[in-house]
Each structure stands twice: as C-alpha cells, then as structure tokens.
Amino acid sequence: MKTHNSKWIGPAALAAAIALAAAGVRAEETPTGLPVYRAESCCDLCPAAADPNSYTSNYMKGFVTLVQGNESDWLFRTNEDLRTEFGTTPEGYRQLKALHDAFKSRGVELVIVYQPTRGMVQRNKLLPADYARFDYDKAVRNFRATLKHFEQLGYWVPDLTPLTDEKVEPAFYFRGDHHWTSYGAERSARIVAETVKEIPAFADIPRKEFVTKKMGRMGKRGTHHRVAGQLCNTTYAFEHSDQFFTEPKGEGGGDLFGDSSLPQITLVGTSHSGTNYNFAGFLSEYMGAEILNVAFPGSGLEGSMLKYLASDEFQKNPPKILIWEFSPLYDLAEDKFYRQALSMLGNACEGEKTLLAGKATLRPGEAGKEVLINGAGRLVEATNSRHQVDIRFSDPSVKKLEGTIWYMTGRREKFQFDKPVTTETNGRFAFNMRDEADWGGLNFFAMEIQPPEGLKEPVEVEVRLCKRHDYHAPANLTARSGN
C-alpha cells in the first residue's frame, strides 16, 4: 500500500506523565509496575453550547449544537451526528450520475464509502433524553435508501449499517472528535473489501498478502472538544487510541511495494482515509491487493479527488477501481465540485483544440485583469453547455482563483474556486462553464481574474477556452444493475 508518511506518538515517560497530569489524566499501577494512564471525565457543557447563536464562526457553525453524552467527554452535534435525513437533491443525483459515467468512460469502477453518523453508530453513548429524541429507525431507513440511490446510479456501494448501534469496544468513533478511530476504520474496511471483491475488474488485479501491526498510540484533541472548549472555556484531555500500519506479509521496512508499478486500486476521500487511521492499510489486508492512497487531512469531499484527477498518475494510468470515502455532512449538490471534476477527468484543455487563449501579469494590490476576450482576434461560438476553461498560474502555490465571466447578453458570473491549504498544489484550475438552468445557453464574452490573495510578487496567468469532454461509456465495459 502506497501512502504518505505518518507520525505517531511515543513521548518520553516523564514528559508524558507531566503532560497527562496537566490534562486531567491519572496513572494507575499495573502488576508489571508500569503506569497505565486513564483520562478522567473533564467537563459539563455550559448553557452557551445549547444556543445556536453562540457558534459564531463558519467553522463553529458545523457543530450546532453540541450535546453531552452519558459520559461527560462524549459529545454529539445535533445537526450532523443526530441527523435523520441523507442523500442529495435531484440535481445532486444528476451530477453524481454524470460523474459516474465519466469515470466509466475511462474504464474506472467507482466505489462510494458513505459513513454512518456518530449518532447511528454510538447512540448508546447518548443521554436518555437525547436517545429517546433521536429517531434511529428513521435515520437507518433513510441512510439505506440513499445507499440504494447511489447504487442505482451505477456506483458500487458497501452497506455499513451493520456497524450501527454498536456496543463493542474500542469504540468506532472518538468521544470528542468527528473522525473514526482506527478500530472504526478497520471494521468498515472489512465490509468495503467484500464489496470490492464483487467487482468483475477486481479479478484481474494482482494479489498480495498484507499484515497489520500496532505502531503505538495516537493522541487527539478532538474537534468537538475544541469547540466545546471555546464555548465554555474548558480544556479536555487528549484522547488516545491505538495506531496501526500495514505492510506486505514477509516484508519489513524498505520499499513497501518491491516494485515501482502503480496499484490498480486508488483511495480518495476525506481525512478519515489519511494515514492516521490506516483505512487504506486495512483495505489492503482484507482485499489482498495494493492501494494507492492519495487522501490527505483537510481534503474535504473533493480535495484529494481533484488533486488526483489532475495528476500524471491518473491521466497516464487510471485505476481499475476508485474508492471514494466521504461522510453525509458534505453537500453532494455542490456544483463547483462537479464542474472541476468533469473537466479535470479528461485533463481539461490538454490535447484539445484551443478556441480562445490569453495571458496576463497580476500584481499585488492591483485590480483584476481581463485575460480572455471573445472577438478580440476572432469571434467564436462558446456556449456554456459545450465549453470549459483551463487556467494556469506561474506560481504553483496559488490556492484560490477569483474572477468574473461576462456573457454576450451582458450577464455576468462571479466565480471562486479554492484548493485545500493542507497540501501542495500546481497552480492549475480547470472547470466546465456553468450550465444549470438557463446558464447553459449563454455565450462567453470575456474573463477577468483577480490577483491571488496574499500575493507578494507578480504572477503570470494563462487561460485557455476549449470544448468540454463528451463522456460516453464504452459498451464493452462491465455493467451493473442501474448502469
């Protein structure tokens, strides 16, 4: 399994003892004489936690409103962890179908790993009043209906609902964080692996045995705990959980692969798929196949997907199977994601005939510059529904694109596309022109681009407009019910 390097915690005993004691953690003697540290319950939520108006920043609004579990350090978000509605809008499902068909045209089978919520999995940790108020049966019913809808669009969809209402330890989720623990990742990977094995393309993927080993302990000050601390001026102890790594059986250290070939299965997703929780490793062990893990912290729904689609790894050697992990909190109807993904999946304007091109130098403190004009040299037909743009900055660290598009009718569109700040980027943005509702028939006139935020030196920007890709799945590709 190819992954990024991970860090794990193994502090000196004295330093650890001091730090843990300061965080409300006590040590108990064991028969071996070695101390075992246990976090004591910390805090009760204050009245501000129950007031949605207390959650003032955009980040904090994602935690409205925190409620305390039957142990004080178990916290839940009522809007997200205790939700009973899932899925997306008709437009969101239409976009998901288009994305599936585009991947299918490249010979890629897509697997959606849709995580059950913390409330569905850990409802036994709720206080009696919240336990009674949370409509678990409705949540599971709607969750399964969403999985079925994904499947009808052509995706392969493992059903993780057997993991709900768990009463086993170690827990699936952290007490005070939205991430799953390594144990939650492992239990999910078992189910996902069985679905992947059903895909006909999996039969042609080389097999390899993997083994998973414990590598130490991970310390986490959870997202729920941090927000509660801001609201109530409290400090929760670090929560510790086992951390694992996976390697080919019989091989230790060195090259994890033994060869330089790319795996034929790729994992994209949120920070849940990052190396901290070893989800990719567990998948490799249970599938018996290598995985290219391109997920990274801070990726969100689309970050690792878009970065991977723009990479040489995907463009020159697309995988046979792409596993896409995300949670229900993300908006699957977000048009900006699909506009970028459907453009980059075909490498945007690379290899396509350029209809319009322009360049400009953007300088700190200056206003935006017009970089592309239809009719300056020649007038071309450039309706939104049939075209895309490919934009490249000379500085690869640019992570935000802002600008305005004008149309022949006089209408205009302000646009903004962002990349995660937690990963290296290449300065390239590409997207299909806006085509929903009455936008599709508009004809492009001009584009203005703003200097990037925090710009200190002049930067060059080049823009190309070309026809968008027309994805038609070849008939000889494996079909599945709903395809």
Swiss-Prot record:
The keyword Transferase applies. It holds the Pfam family CBM_26. GO terms for biological process: alginic acid biosynthetic process. Residues 1-27 form the signal peptide. Its EC number is 2.3.1.-. The active site is at 177, 179 (proton acceptor), 271 (nucleophile). CDD domains: AlgX_C, AlgX_N. It is an enzyme of class 2 (transferase). Belongs to the AlgX family. Consists of two domains, with an N-terminal domain with structural homology to members of the SGNH (GDSL) hydrolase superfamily and a C-terminal carbohydrate-binding module (CBM) that may bind alginate. This is Alginate biosynthesis protein AlgX.
